Amino acid sequence: MDNHIKGALLVCLAATMWGFDGIALTPRLFSLHVPFVVFILHLLPLILMSILFGKEEVKNIKKLQKNDLFFFFCVALFGGCLGTLCIVKALFLVNFKHLTVVTLLQKLQPIFAIILARLLLKEKLKRAYLFWGFLALLGGYLLTFEFHLPEFVSSDNLLPASLYSLLAAFSFGSATVFGKRILKSASFRTALYLRYLMTSCIMFVIVTFTSGFGDFLVATAGNWLIFVIIALTTGSGAILLYYFGLRYITAKVATMCELCFPISSVVFDYLINGNVLSPVQIASAILMIISIIKISKLN
């Protein structure tokens, strides 16, 4: 098989796995506390990676500068902790009714990344960014509320869930910006291991002072099975597939392949939960995704 085709298929597979996770896996952990869920979602992959290559990566981590470690901490704090806390909370709030909306709103992440890159990294902002950024935000609003005001559609926790999803997109976008500062400091494997290590440590502190660890006794066998499936597939497994695929394709091709995420989210939500987007929501999702693609090409 041609390497370009292989790379595209791997990115498509990773994006589809993330879509399946947001619809079918993580929402079914709703009986547990959110901080505990996020902690375990990072701890299990960390344990697996520690067994496979932990000793080698600890040596690589010791070689990093303090400045690099600070930015790694920021990536773990925003991308690993805050972003994941917000998106898991959003998925739990909607009670399987608006999962597609919550997952699709994450696609606004590049908007926040571009804004933060302008503010923090002083990167130039083209006028076209503003145009497509506005259309993306408009599409996100119509996807969530259609032609209504937020207060009129606040049933089913859609409004707070949407806000949590947007905050997650902002947090993931922040992690992307901070990640730009450390791309040349470590390999992807080292960066992935350190991110999960720091996130697990931060979440341990958060769980200690919030929900506690009582969920270890409350979690059912089904909960632990979902945790293991996520750890091996849609968690670190999907990330590895994604970046392995990126080695063989361009960023523009990857952007198109990532459309498997929203498409699979819609399909899985229909097949598993019986939820269907309205015509207005479908049109809004298309507008938002096209705008994000345009922004990615500009970038």
Swiss-Prot record:
Instruction: Give the originating organism.
Output: Fusobacterium nucleatum subsp. nucleatum (strain ATCC 23726 / VPI 4351)
- The answer on whether this UniProt entry bears the keyword Repeat reads yes
- Stated name of the protein: Riboflavin transporter ImpX
Keywords in UniProt for this one?
Cell membrane, Membrane, Repeat, Transmembrane, Transmembrane helix, Transport
Protein induction: Expression is probably regulated by riboflavin, via an FMN riboswitch.
Q: Which residues form the EamA domain?
A: 6-144, 162-294
Of which family is this protein a member?
Belongs to the EamA transporter family.
- Tell me if Transmembrane is a UniProt keyword of this record: yes
Q: How does it sit in the membrane?
A: Multi-pass membrane protein
Q: Name the domain of life this protein comes from.
A: Bacteria
Instruction: Note the InterPro entries from the entry.
Output: AA-Vitamin_Transporters, EamA_dom
Localisation: Cell membrane
Give the stretches traversing the membrane.
7-27, 34-54, 68-88, 101-121, 129-149, 158-178, 202-222, 224-244, 253-273, 276-296
Task: Write down any Gene Ontology CC term.
Answer: plasma membrane
The protein's job, in short, is: Transports riboflavin into the cell.
